[in-house]
Amino acid sequence: MSKVKSITRESWILSTFPEWGSWLNEEIEQEQVAPGTFAMWWLGCTGIWLKSEGGANVCVDFWCGTGKQSHGNPLMKQGHQMQRMAGVKKLQPNLRTTPFVLDPFAIRQIDAVLATHDHNDHIDVNVAAAVMQNCADDVPFIGPKTCVDLWIGWGVPKERCIVVKPGDVVKVKDIEIHALDAFDRTALITLPADQKAAGVLPDGMDDRAVNYLFKTPGGTLYHSGDSHYSNYYAKHGNEHQIDVALGSYGENPRGITDKMTSADILRMGEALNAKVVIPFHHDIWSNFQADPQEIRVLWEMKKDRLKYGFKPFIWQVGGKFTWPLDKDNFEYHYPRGFDDCFTIEPDLPFKSFL
């Protein structure tokens, strides 16, 4: 049979997806984290893989799903949080724009799976299935009550799950995980379709969402999930030493306030007394696409006058950040390769060919 007749849609998908194959899985496994440091990789959206000097591996908000794929239904799902927020009827055109850089089914070494809240782009059934099928049988699933309810509903044993609320601390090898207050007001209006939010006092945030502070021997990482800006960031900054802070950034569409702005990201970094602030989430949705360089420009305008003690860092999905080695860098670039040029004799017609 000729090639063009043997190839199918399914064979095409399997040969190209996930786009990075197991490249990043292998990179993470091979990484030897030096004493006094921690390494992390951006998995897309707010997904992070954190690795400590003691070899602890944890992932947070690793999501392997997608957004809109068809114009079939022109209307938004009834009762969707964005419909509640802005009184809209039209379909939200949120297409996923980020490639899949980590294969969940190639994960073998992992010590904990965490989620900040139960929105679809922060918790994933495929990740849960892959860890249950291929990894150690004692890997815990850690998150607020709504996340644990989802995991259990998917088939993760209850005894493998740990419910956390602000103030709780969980130890995973040499990483101390502190659950802190979340400020995700969108989570509070994520309700069953038949339940009204108007005129009703929202239930507590603590069952729905948490922020995390990861204390490693090499430094600390603050993960804010989908939190909006809050004055309480300053309280967290007063109570904890925070080296690196991650904040959900995006260009909010008209009538919507769901992501922090460039000014909010700077206020967050200042309030937390962080050393480095890194925006994320702006990569994933086509309709919230934002330019993180705006944060850098605004920081340059304000840093001397306001005496900022932090720097912004502009990341790329799939890229690695090592604290404190990268603390003075402003922008990530993927490895460019060719560092071994001219280690063998070039095969060219003549020396000045190129």
Swiss-Prot record:
- A GO-annotated cellular component: cytoplasm
Q: Which InterPro entries match?
A: L-ascorbate_6P_UlaG, Metallo-B-lactamas, RibonucZ/Hydroxyglut_hydro, UlaG-like_MBL-fold, UPF0173_UPF0282_UlaG_hydrolase
Keywords, comma-separated and alphabetical: Cytoplasm, Hydrolase
EC annotation from Swiss-Prot or TrEMBL: 3.1.1.-
Main enzyme class: hydrolase
Intracellular or extracellular location(s): Cytoplasm
Cofactor(s) it depends on: a divalent metal cation
Q: GO molecular-function annotation terms?
A: L-ascorbate 6-phosphate lactonase activity; manganese ion binding
Q: Which biological process, per GO, is one annotated for this protein?
A: L-ascorbic acid catabolic process
The protein's induction, as recorded, is: Induced by L-ascorbate. Repressed by UlaR.
Q: Short name of one Pfam family for this protein? A: Lactamase_B_2
Query: What reaction does this catalyse?
Result: L-ascorbate 6-phosphate + H2O = 3-dehydro-L-gulonate 6-phosphate
Q: Which domain of life is it from?
A: Bacteria
Pathway(s) this gene product operates in, as recorded in its UniProt entry = Cofactor degradation; L-ascorbate degradation; D-xylulose 5-phosphate from L-ascorbate: step 1/4
**Protein family (similarity comment):** Belongs to the UlaG family.
PANTHER family, A to Z: L-ASCORBATE-6-PHOSPHATE LACTONASE ULAG-RELATED, UPF0173 METAL-DEPENDENT HYDROLASE MJ1163-RELATED
Function per UniProt: Probably catalyzes the hydrolysis of L-ascorbate-6-P into 3-keto-L-gulonate-6-P. Is essential for L-ascorbate utilization under anaerobic conditions.
Listed name of the protein: Probable L-ascorbate-6-phosphate lactonase UlaG
**Source lineage:** Bacteria, Pseudomonadati, Pseudomonadota, Gammaproteobacteria, Enterobacterales
